[in-house]
Amino acid sequence: MRNIVLAILLFTCVSLAAQDNGWKLTATDADAAYVGAPVANGGIGILPWKEPFSVRHVILNHVFENGGKHGVSRVLRGINPFLLSLKVDDVAVEGKNIAGWRQEIDMKAAAHITSFDALNKVKVRYSIRALRNMPYAGMIQVEIKALENCAVQVLQRTEVPKEYGVPDTVYTKMKGGQAGQYVVSVSAPSRYGTHKVTGSAGFVYEKKAFDFRLLKEAGAISISRTLQKGETVKFALLGTVC
């Protein structure tokens, strides 16, 4: 009887593990044919891609642009504030200088997860989510581990699709935040003036974990830090599009 109970428990554990694995889809070949899988929350959809930190599009749900006098209305692409880039010792991290690339779609956690080693100096892991309880918001959580002593810089910029009018950029200092922390907001009218869309973003990190810089000429914000071998640092980028 005891053996039967143990066998049932073992079968149950194996079944639960199999069910959990069924929630996840994994890719490890960055050179294979690729189709992005979006994360969405009913308000916005975010489309990650295979290149490091790449986000191809942000789509606004049920927001349509007038097609003009003789055109057809279509879903409006959103302003994209989720663009990040990483430099290690002043060298840009790109697809050609990374190894161990892996992407995972965790359907249970509603997360798109990417990991890789870059320049033999850092191990990077980041996840992209469209926040469930904030319908116009998304978040990118990033973890960087130093494989050797190095300096890292992360740059955030905002992309305005070409079908928009002239953009306007505003930098707002965060109340109650750390000295020098800002949120960057970019607003622009849609082509035919049907909507005015704003994309905003800001970094979130532990106090004194990074040096923050406001790059108005480049229309961007950045954080940087020197890491010692074996040291791990984490931060997040929060963004909204509405």
Specify the residue positions occupied by each region the protein language model found:
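Beta-sandwich/jelly-roll carbohydrate-recognition scaffolds of carbohydrate-active enzymes
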Residues: 19-242
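Sec-dependent N-terminal signal peptides
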Residues: 3-14
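Basic/polar N-terminal segments that are highly enriched at the extreme N-terminus
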Residues: 1, 16-21
